[in-house]
Amino acid sequence: MSLYALLLVALGMSMDAFAVALAKGAAVRMPPRKIAATALVFGTVEAFMPLAGWVGGFYAKPFISEWDHWVAFVLLGGLGLKMMREGLSGEAEDVRESKQESLWMTVLTAFGTSIDSMIVGVGLAFMEVNIAFAAAVIGMAATVMVTIGLTAGKAFGVLFGRRAEFAGGLVLIAIGTWTLLSHLGLIQ
């Protein structure tokens, strides 16, 4: 696989994470340090998933391709509904939110946006590619795209407040629904 092709794959794999980061950045105020930490979590998970897929290879492919869209749909849909509910409630998020809960939600969201990367890893198992390098490139692309998404979302969120959280929830549900419908062959 050429470097150009790998960069395109990495960019494609990071687009779901970018959309989620844009929504999250609009909904929650994050200091630069938190943006960097969140981007690193997404990048790490996004880099790990193709490695896991590569290791699983063709043994996991039938199971993963059969259920990945349902997992993404449930995770992103559930997170989206939670964000919409919070956006409608009008209650400000508790600034003293538990660090463990915050980390858990970040990891869960990162996992939900990177399931397709695992399938890419399965495909990479059948190609001439340095999987460690490919995973690093995919992880770095996700880190950069999440940083951009959170930063751009932060500027957007200042303008639109709680409505942005509701819209962010809609984005998550749309991503999950699109993933499900495209895997079922109902849309392209």
Curated annotation (Swiss-Prot):
What sections of the protein cross the membrane? Answer: 3-23, 35-55, 63-83, 104-126, 140-160, 167-187
Q: Which keywords accompany this UniProt record?
A: Cell inner membrane, Cell membrane, Ion transport, Manganese, Membrane, Transmembrane, Transmembrane helix, Transport
Family per record = Belongs to the MntP (TC 9.B.29) family.
- Which InterPro entries does this one have? Mntp/YtaF, Put_MntP
Reading the lineage from the top rank, the first entry is: Bacteria
Q: Does the keyword Coiled coil apply?
A: no
Species per Swiss-Prot/TrEMBL record: Neisseria gonorrhoeae (strain ATCC 700825 / FA 1090)
This protein is called: Putative manganese efflux pump MntP
Q: Does the keyword Ion transport apply?
A: yes
Q: Where would you say this protein principally sits, based on its record?
A: membrane
Q: Which GO terms describe its molecular function?
A: manganese ion transmembrane transporter activity
Q: Name one Pfam family in it.
A: Mntp
Q: What does this protein do?
A: Probably functions as a manganese efflux pump.
Membrane topology per the record?
A: Multi-pass membrane protein
Which terms in the GO cellular component ontology are assigned? plasma membrane
Compartments, record wording: Cell inner membrane
